[in-house]
């Protein structure tokens, strides 16, 4: 079965006064129908810029997608003109933004915003589109959807707004859904409900999901495969089970080692083996990357070669890829 989404050698840069910021470099991945691929990493690793590049929402200037392809059902989005891309965006590929309060139009009711998109992509008349909007709000388990459809974003709670964003994203049954940290600003209970909701709708519509997150707990709960990014590049890719059981690159090892475990000892009596391990150092500036592996200055396993020669991203074990000279 051919992947619904195929991303090949995607590179995005920003032209700034301090130089060229290489936000995303040679990123490739694919996602099948009904599959969830998680992209994880620290703030500034390039995961959100990757998501915005898929949607062609990079502000130009200062940003620019300089190379690569993003294919949805075989159509390369990077080769489309803006009117054609506008039809794809929200139609075949949709996005749930991190903060719905800034993504939703504060001057339009929720129902009108959903209906407007349905009219654009599916060609429904106004009344049928409004009916679809109410149906989608009901679908995402918003109580009293008829009344809520007439409300403005500021009249809803954070969890309710995120549900409305999901309803809008899925109203036209897209083939690909990009979810950029969809639960970051929500409390744990609402977070779980939103993730369950995305999973339920994904199974119903067969949508391919690209989940952007820094939360490895969310990855373990929802994704089938995971891509780990660092300083704009992929450093590891594997199934979720394989990555958690057998991380190969020192960076994912460090991320997993820094996660508190339920039931672990606390206080000053913790043994060295039980202590949380931090990753020393700082993420390098993307306009001044080191010549070799970008993680080498922070890596406890780095050899001289790591500082001068960038490792290739290659197959290390069956269906398990990494970019590291030491694995």
Task: State the predicted function of each range.
Residues 151-156, 160:
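Conserved ABC ATPase signature
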Residues 42, 176-182, 186-268:
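P-loop NTP-binding/switch modules centered on Walker-like glycine-rich loops
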Residues 143-147, 237-327:
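Short catalytic/signature loops enriched in Gly
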Residues 73-76, 127-147, 256-257:
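Conserved ABC ATPase "signature" region
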Residues 171-175:
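A short, proline-enriched helix->beta-strand linker immediately N-terminal to the Walker B motif
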Residues 66, 77-94, 112, 120, ...:
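ABC ATPase NBD coupling module
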């Amino acid at each position: 079965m051919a992947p619904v989404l195929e991303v090949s050698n995607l590179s995005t840069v920003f032209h700034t006064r301090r130089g060229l910021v290489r936000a995303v470099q040679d990123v490739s991945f694919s996602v099948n129908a009904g599959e969830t691929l998680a992209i994880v990493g620290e703030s500034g690793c390039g995961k959100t810029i990757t998501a915005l590049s898929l949607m062609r929402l990079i502000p130009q200037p200062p940003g620019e997608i300089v190379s690569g392809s993003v294919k949805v059902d075989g159509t390369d989005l990077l080769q489309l003109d803006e009117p054609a891309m506008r039809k794809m965006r929200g139609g075949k590929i949709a996005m749930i933004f991190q903060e719905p309060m800034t993504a939703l139009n504060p001057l339009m009711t929720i129902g009108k915003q959903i209906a407007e998109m349905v009219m654009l992509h599916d060609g429904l008349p106004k009344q049928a589109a409004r009916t679809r909007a109410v149906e989608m709000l009901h679908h995402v388990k918003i109580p009293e959807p008829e009344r809520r459809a007439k409300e403005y974003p500021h009249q809803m709670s954070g969890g309710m707004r995120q549900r409305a964003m999901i309803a809008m994203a899925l109203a036209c049954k897209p083939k690909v859904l990009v979810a950029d940290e969809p639960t970051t600003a929500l409390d744990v209970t609402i977070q779980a409900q939103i993730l369950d909701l995305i999973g339920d709708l994904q199974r119903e519509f067969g949508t391919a999901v690209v989940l952007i997150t820094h939360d490895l707990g969310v990855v373990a709960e929802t994704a089938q495969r995971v891509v780990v990014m660092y300083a704009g590049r992929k450093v590891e890719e594997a199934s979720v089970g394989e990555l958690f059981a057998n991380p190969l690159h020192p960076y994912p090892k460090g991320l997993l080692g820094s996660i508190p475990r339920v039931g672990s000892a606390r206080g000053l009596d913790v043994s060295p083996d039980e202590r949380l391990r931090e990753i020393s150092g700082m993420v390098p500036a993307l306009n001044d990357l080191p010549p070799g592996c970008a993680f080498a200055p922070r890596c406890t396993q780095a050899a001289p070669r790591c500082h001068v020669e960038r490792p290739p991203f290659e197959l290390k074990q069956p269906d398990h890829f990494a970019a590291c000279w030491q694995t």
